[in-house]
């Protein structure tokens, strides 16, 4: 659960906050309750008290136009409604009654010199990533030709060896063994590596390899968008493998269908070349070029002409 103190600490470089009141409530939770990040923070809104309230110059001018009694009434309703925090943008100085009420209700009140619109934009981006649905999957995540590729399969099939071969061919490692995936936008899944395993690749017989040290800075990536899953299967698993799928195979990942390719592992097969070919073919499909569909149309035309 994200707290106000975490929000302050995580954004210290971009948004310098100063505590005014309610510091004892620094551990107050910021709950998403299924809401989008855009709904978790915004300009002062008395109708939606459950989001982070931002006071800009216009909001503070509107608030101070009320008499003291009416201000206290509205603010009491807002604070009792479960507001996570109140943020004053543009370096504004709050009226004393606002400070007193935040202290009384133990609601964090903070100030920052950042402009209100910029503050909201920065926090929406931050909250969208921080509160995004996440999962951890077993596999190797790579940047292959600019496409985020997740290699999966049962243990012992050579996922790490395949990743090492692809890295030696100029592609980049994102994560090995434990891949953290986050749905940061409605149609975007980002994958990254846990801090503990960054730059490391485990290969049977060699142990842990520091890819960044061995291959250089350009051999690793911090994050990539997941676009393709390459699933390795044993050559004996005929019941799980379709030689020529007529429809694209997809796998559900955090509620999104991700394109999936299945490759058989057998002696003499160059899997690195096959993965590169699968990625190039996926790029063509993303551009609207369907090789199998074009072939089937060509075949239908040939059958039609031969029947005349």
UniProtKB/Swiss-Prot annotation:
Gene3D superfamilies reported for this sequence: HprK N-terminal domain-like, P-loop containing nucleotide triphosphate hydrolases
Region (Important for the catalytic mechanism of both phosphorylation and dephosphorylation) residue spans: 201-210
Coiled-coil residues: none
Keyword GTP-binding set for record: no
GO MF annotation terms: ATP binding; magnesium ion binding; phosphorelay sensor kinase activity; protein serine/threonine kinase activity; protein serine/threonine/tyrosine kinase activity
Binding site for Mg(2+): 160, 202
CDD domains: HprK_C
Cofactor: Mg(2+)
The keyword Signal appears for this protein: no
Gene Ontology process terms (BP): regulation of carbohydrate metabolic process
Assembly notes: Homohexamer.
Matches recorded under HAMAP family: HPr_kinase
Record remark: domains: The Walker A ATP-binding motif also binds Pi and PPi.
Protein name: HPr kinase/phosphorylase
Species in which this protein is naturally found: Bordetella pertussis (strain Tohama I / ATCC BAA-589 / NCTC 13251)
Encoding gene (name): hprK
């Amino acid at each position: 659960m994200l707290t106000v103190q975490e929000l302050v600490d995580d954004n210290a470089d971009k948004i310098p906050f100063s505590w005014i009141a309610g510091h004892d409530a620094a551990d107050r939770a910021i709950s998403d309750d299924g809401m989008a990040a855009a709904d978790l923070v915004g300009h002062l809104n008395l109708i939606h008290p459950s989001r982070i309230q931002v006071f800009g110059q216009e909001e503070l001018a509107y608030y101070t136009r009320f008499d003291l009694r009416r201000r206290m009434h509205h603010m009491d309703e807002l604070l009792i409604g479960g507001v996570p925090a109140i943020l004053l943008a543009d370096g504004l100085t709050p009226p004393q009654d606002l400070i007193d009420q935040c202290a009384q209700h133990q609601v964090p009140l903070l100030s920052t010199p950042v402009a209100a619109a910029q503050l909201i934009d920065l926090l929406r981006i931050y909250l969208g990533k921080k509160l995004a649905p996440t999962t951890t999957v077993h596999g190797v995540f790579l940047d292959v030709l600019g496409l985020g590729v997740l290699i999966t399969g049962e243990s012992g099939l050579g996922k790490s060896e395949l990743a090492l071969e692809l890295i030696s061919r100029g592609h980049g490692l994102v994560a090995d063994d434990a891949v953290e995936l986050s749905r940061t936008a409605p149609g975007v899944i980002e994958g990254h590596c846990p801090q503990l395993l960054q730059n490391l690749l485990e290969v049977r017989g060699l142990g842990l390899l520091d890819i960044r040290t061995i291959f250089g800075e350009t051999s690793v990536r911090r994050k990539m968008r997941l676009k393709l899953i390459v699933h390795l299967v044993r050559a004996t698993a005929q019941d799980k493998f379709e030689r020529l799928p007529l429809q694209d195979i997809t796998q559900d990942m955090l509620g999104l269908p991700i394109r999936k390719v299945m490759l058989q592992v057998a002696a003499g097969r160059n899997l690195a070349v096959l993965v590169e070919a699968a990625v190039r073919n996926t790029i063509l499909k993303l551009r609207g070029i369907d090789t199998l569909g074009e072939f089937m149309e060509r075949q239908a035309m040939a059958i039609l002409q031969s029947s005349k």
